[in-house]
């Protein structure tokens, strides 16, 4: 059963492929904000995937990237389900490298019917 307090986690090592330079979100070889956001979303998704048979889609990210992380360092994203409002799920998300917090914010996901959602997208 889905309840607030469910936590998730996802990890990756900073490499050239997830750097700001490679993601075209900046010029430097440091962990890219889009990569951090994707890792946070992955942590939230993984935390509820086993609890819900229905589909889940991300709809909102409000995140601050507060510290740069160099190549080779591991990043861990953590999520906590803090609110359930019918089909809307709200998560607190945080990201840490080996030296401390690098990002924080909130993420919303909605529970959906996968087939109907895919059909609607395909009919655009």
Where are these regions (language model features)?
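C-terminal binding/interaction regions
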Residues: 3-6, 85-91, 100-121
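Hydrophobic beta-sheet segments that form the core/acyl-binding groove
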Residues: 63-98
């Amino acid at each position: 059963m889905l309840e607030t307090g469910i936590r998730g986690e996802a990890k990756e090592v900073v490499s050239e492929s997830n750097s700001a330079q490679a993601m075209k979100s900046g010029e430097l070889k440091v962990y890219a904000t889009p990569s951090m956001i994707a890792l946070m979303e992955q942590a939230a998704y993984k935390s509820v995937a086993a609890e819900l048979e229905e589909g889940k889609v991300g709809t909102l990210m409000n995140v601050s990237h507060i510290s740069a992380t160099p190549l080779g360092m591991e990043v861990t994203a953590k999520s906590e389900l803090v609110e359930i409002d019918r089909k809307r799920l709200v998560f607190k998300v945080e990201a840490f490298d080996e030296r401390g917090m690098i990002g924080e914010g909130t993420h919303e996901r909605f529970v959906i019917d996968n087939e109907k959602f895919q059909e609607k997208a395909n009919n655009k």
